């Protein structure tokens, strides 16, 4: 029976009897519904395969809820453990204010996070819902630190600045609106600070074939950074960057550039802050991308795969004894993250640790990257700049239209879900558990779609 026949008046008051076919119509009455046309079957989907509850089609998921499902959907270590499912249900009944009322599941999560993902040099932790708020609180920590360092009081604190990169996406909340600069539609008409912004020296791949261009881009960016520090007259509180700019185009920043920026921060008494919301929790082959780049950040914002977002702090933050991690309610929120998310995250992190998933990511990431490079070699006029660190992989297409058409064909003809980024890039965000034969299917879908687009020109 069709939607109109069952609900001719658009009345969905019998929500207990809502069917998969009704989902889009029910949502459209109250919301902008511009996502995928499938309806996620939460029971039938598994691993890297999403099932459409309407058509029963299976989709290879290289999206993973915007890189937030580390072990895919319905991981066996969760759904096949009845005792754990009961534990998760108990945690979901109530939503306690974790910063004020403590519990065993909360403490277990914190200890597990510190053991599996923690950095001994960044012992301070803060948890909150949402990646933007993770970055927001990292910025607050840096701004407070700098204000105390300089002995500033209001209104002089308004002079403090945050140095950041072009093509950054740090979120869509208060302070982060002044940093995000990918698509104008995400920040237009919202008041923003005029904080200093320098070019992003994204590596062209393979780096060995673009040494001169890459070095020149980094030289210009570093010169602009020096000029920004000089112009700010000591008022830059921090520099923040994504080690790999996700939404901005999967732009990889070199270890040499980021190390140079870290030195500039030290020379100018500013904190060095990394946004690892998308690149953290193992997708690059280590807990954090910065661990492969020879960096020692003072603050790291995290989220997505960690289920609970937040900030790791340490380094020079403790040069100010009354920093935000040490003063009651200086940074806080009602729930300080969600307890049910923490219980789920604990099991996910235990599974990651037990199965040594990060080692697998290194191997599968190389396999994926080799396949993308081979595809680029076979279609040099269409596929370029194949790149990746671990499973955080991407390619460029000639223009936005071509990229969008390739994505459309992958989805409609091959049931493969991937993501756009930047002006003409196509990115892959699979679960850390994706198998080689599933990578093969992804590569075949991409190759077939690229061929179809090339032949239609």
Swiss-Prot record:
Enzyme class: transferase
pH dependence: Optimum pH is 7.0-7.5.
The keyword Cell wall biogenesis/degradation appears for this protein: no
Keyword Transferase assigned: yes
Reactions performed catalytically: L-lysine + 2-oxoglutarate = (S)-2-amino-6-oxohexanoate + L-glutamate
Pathway participation: Antibiotic biosynthesis; cephamycin C biosynthesis
Temperature dependence: Optimum temperature is 30 degrees Celsius.
Binding positions (pyridoxal 5'-phosphate): 131-132, 278
Binding-site list for 2-oxoglutarate: 172, 278, 427
A biological process term (GO) from this entry: gamma-aminobutyric acid catabolic process
Listed EC numbers: 2.6.1.36
Binding site for L-lysine: 172
Sequence positions bearing N6-(pyridoxal phosphate)lysine: 304
Single GO MF descriptor: L-lysine 6-transaminase activity
Stated role: Catalyzes the transfer of the terminal amino group of L-lysine to alpha-ketoglutarate to yield L-glutamate and 2-aminoadipate 6-semialdehyde ((S)-2-amino-6-oxohexanoate), which is spontaneously converted to the dehydrated form 1-piperideine 6-carboxylate. Shows a high specificity for L-lysine as substrate although L-ornithine can also be used, leading to the formation of an o-aminobenzaldehyde reactive compound. Only cis-oxaloacetate and pyruvate can replace alpha-ketoglutarate, but with very low efficiency.
Subunit annotation: Monomer.
Protein name: L-lysine-epsilon aminotransferase
Biological source species: Streptomyces clavuligerus
Gene: lat
